[in-house]
Regions:
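Short amphipathic alpha-helical segment within the helicase RecA-like ATPase core
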Residues: 196
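ATP-dependent helicase/translocase motor core
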Residues: 1-184, 193
Length: 196
């Protein structure tokens, strides 16, 4: 799986990297895999468990490794834990762990790290009244922003016909891109009339 995503031992990946600061008698540990960026900084840690073990067993150990790596390199890595069948990804400063179908590439991980550093708060954003200016639309947009600020990855708005769902969605997309929370947003139109 790592090779499919472009990770290679000769260029951007290390196995059994020793780290200090672990909460054990020796104070040391060995990270199964560390994935590095082009600048030499660690982008991710991977905790690999046996195929017979639930991958989630490695979550806390992977977090401890990430703590040690961050203390040494001053950059919080993305956390992966896997058993070879299941892969979990965790950006623990941003979101809850989630199951993924594979490992991210070097560019994709770098984008996550960069976005984490560059994104701005959603709590006090300017909402363009030319797009969505009705009071209930503004409240809906603010509610979605607060939900994302709290670390949730999803938000759901239920709005009646004629209330400006499309304008509200466009305004949310604008806020997320302007604040560096999203680069690309897929908007699925439910009818041909909206699409045209």
């Amino acid at each position: 799986e790592l090779k499919i995503a472009g990770w290679d031992f000769d260029t951007n990946m290390t196995a059994e990297l020793p780290v200090s600061g672990m909460p054990n008698n020796e104070g040391t540990g060995y990270v199964d895999y560390v994935l590095f960026g082009e600048n030499g900084l660690p982008l991710a840690v991977v905790e690999a468990k046996k195929t017979s073990v639930d991958a989630r067993v490695g979550q806390n150990q992977a977090k401890l490794y990430a703590d040690c790596i961050e203390a040494e390199h001053h950059q919080r890595p993305i956390i992966y834990y896997t058993n070879g069948y299941e892969i979990y990804m965790w950006d623990d400063k941003e979101y809850a762990p989630r199951r993924v179908s594979g490992f991210y590439t070097q560019d994709e991980l770098q984008l996550l790290i960069d976005r984490r550093k560059n994104k701005q708060s959603l709590l006090h954003v300017y909402i363009d009244p030319n797009i969505a200016g009705r009071e209930y639309q503004l409240e809906a947009i603010k509610s979605v922003c607060e939900t994302f600020e709290e670390g949730h990855r999803k938000a759901l708005l239920v709005m009646a016909t004629g209330t400006g769902k499309t304008r509200t969605a466009i305004s949310i997309a604008k806020v997320l891109t302007e604040q560096n929370w999203a680069k690309n947003i897929l908007f699925l139109a439910p009818t041909i009339a909206i699409k045209n």
